[in-house]
Amino acid sequence: MSAIYNFCAGPAMLPAAVMKKAQQELLDWNGLGVSVMEVSHRGKEFIALTKQAEADLRELMHIPQNYHVLFMHGGGRGQFSAVVNNFLGNQGRALYLVSGQWSSAALAEAQKLAGDAQIDSLNIVEKHNCLNAVVLPDLHKIDADYRYVHYCPNETVDGIEIFDELDSPWPIVADLSSTIMSREIDVSRYGLIYAGAQKNIGPSGLSIVIVRDDMLTLPSLPQSSIMDYRLAVEHDSMFNTPPTFAWYLAAEVFAWLKSIGGVASIAKINQQKAQMLYACIDANPFYKNGVVAANRSQMNVTFQLADESLDGAFLKEAEAVGLVALKGHRIVGGMRASLYNAMPLEGVAALVTFMNEFAAKHYNI
């Protein structure tokens, strides 16, 4: 069977080496004669797995010791509510920076749950020559006392990424669901980082939360116990039965990333992949991207065809040659190629070849 390259925005493709290892030991994990899905989450073998997973993630992201690493339920949307309930209290105030669909969704959830607390927001995307561009505000000029400022450095739907470090006088809460471990960041700049697993970590159903000690002293609201960061810390992410298979696969992805040189190594590859695809788009008038170069997402490349009536043919012909899940999000349409860590350079090269051939066949210059 020829190679299939899966450009899905999430759940996304996993590293082939990880999938093969999971396949090989699916029925007999660690010589126990049973699957990892069948062992107790409190057994010594699984506890050892969780400890190694945390150690590997700390090493990969250079996480300081005054941060807790949590493996939680709920995905990114679950964290939208968890952040509010854990940090805002009854009289708190928070600022949300809006750059696209996911930061808008986080804002909407905060507004729904805030009660007597105050939620402020700033739209940080402007049009520059008809292209979307991020303009980060000078937060130090805002006269307010916020518990936290929330932002999403990469908008998967809109194809917008913020590469500049956010400078804030208040704790930063960041949704890194689509960029975690794709490039190096300074974790110490953040009060809390959260990420749904289904893009760069593993299968859906698991969220990673990296939270600084002092954030856990902020007033909280009544909430579900399984989304309480303090309880998660107290119980080593096992207040209730965790998604064990997702945790296992995340551990394998961390080990795989370490084996290929870590985040610094994959960051170079990710940059190459994105540059290759954007070069194709820019060189061919048949394709267009609506984001300024400085804010083009490395993880989620969005583009439109010059003739949208050919969208169906593009997707059908791409799938026929093993390039799948290229349809853009229903909100914005067009195409989207998600280039997460597991996508090899060969997959992007195959997509570029197809795009050039498709344009030559359908576009009259």
Swiss-Prot record:
Its cofactor is pyridoxal 5'-phosphate. Its main location: cytoplasm. Pathway: Amino-acid biosynthesis; L-serine biosynthesis; L-serine from 3-phospho-D-glycerate: step 2/3; Cofactor biosynthesis; pyridoxine 5'-phosphate biosynthesis; pyridoxine 5'-phosphate from D-erythrose 4-phosphate: step 3/5. Belongs to the class-V pyridoxal-phosphate-dependent aminotransferase family. SerC subfamily. It is found in: Cytoplasm. The modification N6-(pyridoxal phosphate)lysine is found at residue 199. It comes from Shewanella oneidensis (strain ATCC 700550 / JCM 31522 / CIP 106686 / LMG 19005 / NCIMB 14063 / MR-1). Catalyzes the reversible conversion of 3-phosphohydroxypyruvate to phosphoserine and of 3-hydroxy-2-oxo-4-phosphonooxybutanoate to phosphohydroxythreonine. L-glutamate binds at residue 42. Pyridoxal 5'-phosphate binds at residues 76-77, 102, 156, 175, 198, 240-241. GO terms for cellular component: cytoplasm. Its EC number is 2.6.1.52. It catalyses: O-phospho-L-serine + 2-oxoglutarate = 3-phosphooxypyruvate + L-glutamate; 4-(phosphooxy)-L-threonine + 2-oxoglutarate = (R)-3-hydroxy-2-oxo-4-phosphooxybutanoate + L-glutamate. GO terms for biological process: L-serine biosynthetic process; pyridoxine biosynthetic process. Homodimer. It is an enzyme of class 2 (transferase). Keywords: Amino-acid biosynthesis, Aminotransferase, Cytoplasm, Pyridoxal phosphate, Pyridoxine biosynthesis, Serine biosynthesis, Transferase. The keyword Cytoplasm applies. GO terms for molecular function: O-phospho-L-serine:2-oxoglutarate aminotransferase activity; pyridoxal phosphate binding. Binds 1 pyridoxal phosphate per subunit. It holds the Pfam family Aminotran_5. This is Phosphoserine aminotransferase.
